[in-house]
Amino acid sequence: MLRRESIGDKYLNKSEQGFSLLELMAVILIIAIAATMTMPLLQHQIAAREIDTIARRFIAHAHFARQQAIHLGQPFLLMPTVRGDWSSGWVVKSGCIGKSANAACIEKRWFIQGNIQPIHFKSNGKQFIDPNTGKKGILFNASGAAKTAQGGFVANRLVLGHERVPDLERQMILGSGGRWRICDPATDAKRCH
């Protein structure tokens, strides 16, 4: 836009500082190209954070079940809410569990985790299946040890995946010492085995 200024009896045309429409469109095009190039990486990072959040939540609930079993001196069970499908959610409960459950016991549910979509548990991994009953779950006895319903020790893994990024996974591993770890097989395959 031109502005007129007068110096004495003469008029000078001066332009104001600013950007033309063409320059503005070029900048918007550059921003759009950069956003298009970085979007897949951003979606991958969001999916990785979602998987990590669910993994940490599951481990926190397992730690809670173990600590309550020790504190209250009774068994606690962490199990899927729907017929052996961890992806539908899980429940932490106490009472009426194990071989020594009596008729007067009252079951108490401490935590219930709902559906975790778009995260899902992959079928590879043992998924804490009791070899005798075929049921999934982790039973913590009064001393805090993870056992099966028949008394066998549990050292196992669960594998988490994401619906939108199929090649992304995290493994939650319960070691023989009762310690949990989360590993990414894409970056530390040696630690995952």
Segments from the language model and where they lie:
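N-terminal helix-rich module
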Residues: L2-Y11, M37, Q43-R57, Q67, ...
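Alpha-helical hydrophobic helix detector
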Residues: M25-L41
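Generic recognition of well-ordered alpha-helical segments
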Residues: A60-F64
